[in-house]
Structures are given as C-alpha cells and as structure tokens.
Amino acid sequence: MKSIRRGDGLNVVPFIDIMLVLLAIVLSISTFIAQGKIKVSLPNAKNAEKSQPNDQKVVVISVDEHDNIFVDDKPTNLEALSAVVKQTDPKTLIDLKSDKSSRFETFISIMDILKEHNHENFSISTQAQ
C-alpha cells in the first residue's frame, strides 16, 4: 500500500510576494494619475490664495492655449458646457482654469454661461508669483 505524503501542495508565498509588489506599484502610480491631464499654464497673480481642500465635489473647467474647452479633462464645446452647467447643482464648486495664452473671449463666454444658469459658486485658478 502506498503512503500519502503530507506537505505536497501549492506554495503560495511567491504569489503573495508578487501581489504585494504589484499593489505597491499600482498605489504609487495612482497618485500621478489623480493630477489633471490637461496642460494649462495658469496666469500669475501676486495676491493668489491657496485653495482649501475639502470634501465638496468640484467640477473643473479647463481652457488650453488653443482655446479648447475641457470639463473634468473631457473635451467639450460651449453648447455642451452650457448643458453641463445647467445640470450641475448650484452649490457645486466650479473651478475655472484658463491658460494665460488663451483668448479672453473664451473666458468671458464661460463666465456668461455660468451667469446664465445662475451658478455663482466658482473659483478662478491662478498661479502665485
């Protein structure tokens, strides 16, 4: 009669080691992804205030140097932006990031849309000098 050896089985320790390394990589990379992807060179301001982080939902409207408009890093146009602002709760903060090389007309168009929909809770991002 054959004897059954105990101890034969799958060694999971190397698998756990690999999973921990992958977890560390994912966590370190995810901090870089959280940053905005649209490159916007903000205008300088001497009296710029540092924004206070809070748990409030923020909708970010970005305008790049070629006057392309983005809502939360997704490309859009003025008509679609108007629909987004209309659907957004008036208490939700809208952060406007306009590139210093973009046309002022685009900035004013966005401000008109905010005013049209009575959305007064917004901030304009600048870079401290």
UniProtKB/Swiss-Prot annotation:
It comes from the Bacteria. InterPro entries: ExbD (IPR003400), TonB_ExbD_2 (IPR014171). It is a single-pass type II membrane protein. It is found in: Cell inner membrane. The chain crosses the membrane at residues 13-33. GO terms for molecular function: transmembrane transporter activity. Belongs to the ExbD/TolR family. PANTHER family: BIOPOLYMER TRANSPORT PROTEIN EXBD, EXBD MEMBRANE COMPONENT OF PMF-DRIVEN MACROMOLECULE IMPORT SYSTEM. This is Biopolymer transport protein ExbD. The gene is exbD.
